[in-house]
Swiss-Prot record:
It comes from Kluyveromyces lactis (strain ATCC 8585 / CBS 2359 / DSM 70799 / NBRC 1267 / NRRL Y-1140 / WM37). Allows the formation of correctly charged Gln-tRNA(Gln) through the transamidation of misacylated Glu-tRNA(Gln) in the mitochondria. The reaction takes place in the presence of glutamine and ATP through an activated gamma-phospho-Glu-tRNA(Gln). The lineage of its organism: Eukaryota, Fungi, Dikarya, Ascomycota, Saccharomycotina. Disulfide bonds: none annotated. This is Glutamyl-tRNA(Gln) amidotransferase subunit B, mitochondrial. The keyword Ligase applies. It is an enzyme of class 6 (ligase). Pfam families: GatB_N (PF02934), GatB_Yqey (PF02637). Subunit of the heterotrimeric GatFAB amidotransferase (AdT) complex, composed of A, B and F subunits. This protein may be expected to contain an N-terminal transit peptide but none has been predicted. Gene3D superfamilies: 1.10.10.410. It is found in: Mitochondrion. InterPro entries: Asn/Gln-tRNA_amidoTrfase_suB/E (IPR017959), Asn/Gln-tRNA_Trfase_suB/E_cat (IPR006075), Asn/Gln_amidotransferase (IPR018027), Asn/Gln_tRNA_amidoTrase-B-like (IPR003789), GatB (IPR004413), GatB_Yqey_C_2 (IPR023168), Gln-tRNA_amidoTrfase_suB_CS (IPR017958), Gln_synth/guanido_kin_cat_dom (IPR014746). Signal peptide: none annotated. GO terms for molecular function: ATP binding; glutaminyl-tRNA synthase (glutamine-hydrolyzing) activity.
Length: 539
């Protein structure tokens, strides 16, 4: 039996997983999102569940540890964050919602109940749309319906020690504000689920209401799954996206296997299962379901809103990522989907160097400055140049040199960056020389060689380092350089592969050698055209 389970788990979580047409998958998600408010939900304790991890019970107040006589005071910042998310998800906001007590006993919940919104949630009936182009799903678009959003408090954390049988309780996380978002069972494949989680993470980060990190527990996902309308199975203990998808794969195959063996009767009762990392295991069934004895919380007044408040908050919500992404792919920007996503997807990987708000602002300002400069000097406007240089060249240098974008903007503001782009588009300097110039400026700034108050003189730097593009080079000179490279390379196989089209990109290697010889002062396109002509490759 043990061997069967191991092989079964390995087979289920493999890359060949497939939803069978005769066994239809229906999934819904329950997502708990920690809000990054300044204080906790019902107390003035600092809301820093991931800070001071070596100091358990440090960020706590009398209410957080349930000292008798203490009462909850609602944090209005949490209400504001919930309202922003509700509006972004197009939910119907309840103008009169209230809190309820969910009773159960566990060590990390010293109150003996959790304050949540069971009977009258904060908002309901929303949706989040997924797109084929933006989210890599199979359908042209897919609407995922949101049943409700509710505000509730997080629990403390149980810490297990393997050296003894004691369980320790850390209440730093106790009373941290949460939003629980529940979807309809609208998901029918894994691509939709992955896309939704990624988009929801991006949304809460964009609204600046949560870090959205699964790994730290700032966002926690439970899955409700059924096959062919058998009873719902809830999957818990899913710490990251791979766990979520692997647990669904395993559970889908487990249930299909049971149905095919004639054991479908065992799937007629609602069940909660946990994910161990290799298989799902039963936690409880409908027969052992907990009676939480919900009741309205008598110590908290209702949350009363007005249409004017809702409309006022709606005006403060920034343009949503999907709208920004689509705008960037249209005129006048014309970006590729990949570049547009880089400017709109909010990840936490580079927070110490730049925020995506700063990155977008840098792009838009530089784009406008470059466009104005081209118009003023009657030069050709190359619309993709700002994105190419900000996303690929500037960010690459910032990450390598670990320089914050906000500091670079002091010496290389959008107007100055636009000057550099104009020098490149006018072919005053080549792309390669432009890269050297940008790298030199950033490196000099890092080493305090540049003073922010003194504007950069690009022409002086070009003269100093002899970076002027060679514009009067003839075709014969280009051919001599290219022919010498082909001869010295002495690699007939590579040349034949380029000619036959088997390895077209190998010509980039030849161009790189030519750029090295010319010290980057001749445009790479000139060399590429010459190589293709010499080798008889279609341009």
């Amino acid at each position: 039996m043990l061997v069967f389970r191991r092989n079964y788990a390995k087979r289920n979580t493999g890359s060949k997983f497939k939803i069978l047409p005769e066994y239809k998958l229906k999934c819904g998600l329950e997502i708990h999102t920690q809000l990054n408010t300044d204080n906790k939900l019902f107390s003035m304790s600092t809301n820093s569940p991931f800070a001071d991890v070596d100091k358990p019970n440090y960020h706590t107040s009398y209410f957080d540890v349930s000292i008798p006589g203490t009462q909850p005071i609602l944090n209005l910042q949490a209400v504001l964050f919930a309202l922003k998310l509700s509006l972004a998800l197009r939910c119907k906001v309840s103008l009169n919602s209230h809190f309820d007590r969910k009773h159960y006993f566990y060590g990390d919940q010293p109150l003996g109940y959790q304050i949540t919104q069971h009977y009258n949630p904060f908002s309901s009936k929303g949706k989040l749309r997924l797109y084929k182009d933006l989210d890599s799903i199979e359908e042209a678009f897919k609407d995922i319906s949101v049943i409700q959003l509710q505000i509730e408090q997080d629990t403390g954390k149980s810490v297990y020690n393997s050296t003894d049988s004691n369980t320790k309780i850390d209440l730093n996380r106790s009373n941290v504000p949460l939003i629980e978002m529940v979807t309809e069972p609208d998901f029918t494949d894994l691509k939709q689920i992955r896309a939704f989680i990624k988009k929801y993470q991006n949304l809460v980060r964009h609204l600046k209401i949560s870090t959205g990190d699964l790994e730290t527990g700032a966002m926690r996902v439970d899955v409700n799954l059924s096959i062919n309308d058998y009873a719902r199975v809830e999957l818990k203990n899913l710490p990251n996206t791979s766990s979520i998808t692997n647990a669904i794969k395993y559970e889908y195959n487990r249930q299909v296997n049971m149905i095919e063996k004639g054991e479908g009767d065992q799937l007629k009762h609602t069940e909660t299962r946990g994910w161990t990392g290799s298989e799902t295991v039963k936690l409880r069934t409908k027969e052992s379901i907990i009676d939480y004895r919900y009741m309205p919380d008598p110590e908290l007044p209702n949350i009363l809103l007005t249409n004017e408040i809702v409309e006022g908050v709606e005006k403060t919500i920034p343009t949503l990522p999907d709208d920004t992404c689509m705008m960037l792919m249209q005129e006048p920007y014309g970006l590729t989907l990949k570049d547009a996503k880089i400017l709109t997807i909010n990840s936490n990987g580079h927070d110490d160097l730049y925020s995506h708000d700063e990155l977008r602002a840098c792009y838009f300002s530089t784009f406008d400055a470059y466009h104005s400069l081209c118009k003023k000097q009657n030069e050709e406007f190359v619309r993709k140049l700002p994105a190419n240089w900000i996303i690929h060249e500037l960010l690459g240098n910032l990450n390598k040199m670990e320089i914050p974008l906000i500091k670079v903007s002091h010496i290389l503001p959008p107007e100055k960056f636009a000057e550099l782009l104009l020098l490149i588009s006018k072919k005053t300097i080549s792309n390669a020389s432009g890269k050297l110039l940008l790298s030199h400026i950033l490196n000099s700034f890092k080493e305090n060689s540049f003073v922010a108050s003194e504007p950069i003189n690009f022409n002086a730097l070009i003269e100093e380092f002899e970076l002027h593009a060679v514009s009067d080079v003839g075709s014969e000179e280009l051919e001599l350089i290219c022919e010498s490279i082909i001869t010295e390379l002495n690699n007939n196989k590579m040349i034949e592969d380029i000619k036959s089209g088997k390895k077209k990109n190998s010509i980039k290697f030849l161009v790189g050698q030519a750029m090295r010889i010319s010290q980057g002062r001749i445009q790479a396109q000139e060399f590429e055209i010459t190589f293709k002509r010499l080798l008889g490759v279609e341009p």
